[in-house]
Amino acid sequence: NISLGSSATAVSTLLGTKVNITTPIVQVMTKEDFDFQDLEPAVGVEISYVKGLSGKSVMLFSRNDVRVIVSMMMGAEIPEEEFVMDEINASAIREAMNQMMGASATALSEFLGTTVDISTPISYEIDDGNAFKDKYFDGSEDSVVIRFTLEIEGKLSSEFINIMSVDLVKRLLEPFKAQFGI
């Protein structure tokens, strides 16, 4: 939540309007239990932590939410029936996520007391939900699934999902353990 507050500020600046990302709902899930049909058709955005942390963070957005964000960035409404995830739109959503996750990494750096750097985001449409789950849910390992409400003033009230490995989340929680003796 600390890092996503910074993310909301970064996206607000990019879009020129108020953006709110609500308190997360966190669940540890198996591949079999994970479902994202409410976001389909969905767009995935993956970043890798390249310094300070190890692992991937994957965000899932509905295709329509991506359309709204890209439209705002481009300054022109893109009708739903005309929106395609071509290179221009994919680049725009990567830039939005780069701003969002870059701000998140900066907040994490301060929180963890170490520099946290991320890779350039990779964005893609999810054509096969099972292949997506096979890629991001490592065998029988559980993953941490975090749902957020995304509100863009006057434009959007929706959800997005963040998926991380249990190991990555444990690393993120280490400062709490130290501070509270957990």
Predicted regions: what they are:
Residues 1-181:
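Composition-driven recognition of glycine/serine/threonine/acidic- and proline-rich low-complexity segments
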